[in-house]
């Protein structure tokens, strides 16, 4: 049992050491390419902002985003090296089963998955706020400042509509607020413009309120009225990067809230939510594939295994990207879209495991 524990520690150290080395190596290359691509933008920004606001937050974001690739490369590389040095054969010949040999690999995968899940759920989203703010200021502004045809259920039975909203002057045009009681319209407020003040506080201008009571109607007109409407500009000014700046609990609450309000464009948020868990699970799947694939000693050396491993890992990332577009288009649910690659590659892992040397 003592020998097995030493082997476990040996494999875990090899796995994690290769994993973090692969991350460091690829990140160094990525930084060089990124500097070359955005050099003009970086020269406009203060050096401290480029280092601490951008790169300090970009590196963990990129490492976590492509963690499945780094995991696969690490498994393929060090397992192929073990097989090439006949260490796998020696372990199996000593009485250790292939199934038992899987244990330290899965322990390593669990460590990586837990780390990735924690980072993607709680650490990277706040860091992305700073990184994306830097990008919007110095590289390319992707802020959304306009929205049109906004319709939200702000409360049960209360529907708000804004024909157009301009965030530069915090003004909405052709605003209406309708209150229903069991599908019967009870009140309707209309205004030419509405100005955002602070949390839930708005000012309506050139307004008219129509209150309905059976066959009777009460009409109220005015030039300006401060009122509370439980909506924020962030509820409808949605950019592509917003989902990356929310922690998982925030993302869960936001999705639930927007669904209650009848907001349609939340696919990116649902995809991001499912992606975080699917990517963590991918660590186990790709570890199983990599170990089963590279545990056999081949005549061509470990270059063949590394080539096949890179092909499979890139195909996984490509497949994940393609299926996410299906979710955005509405062809499938975000959950199914994010988990289809894992399901298919789990089948591949099972097939390779059965064909691996025992």
For each feature predicted by the language model, list its residue ranges.
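Small/flexible residues
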Residues: 190, 205, 212, 277-278
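Structural signature for solvent-exposed beta-strand/loop edge elements and short helix-capping sites
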Residues: 154-207
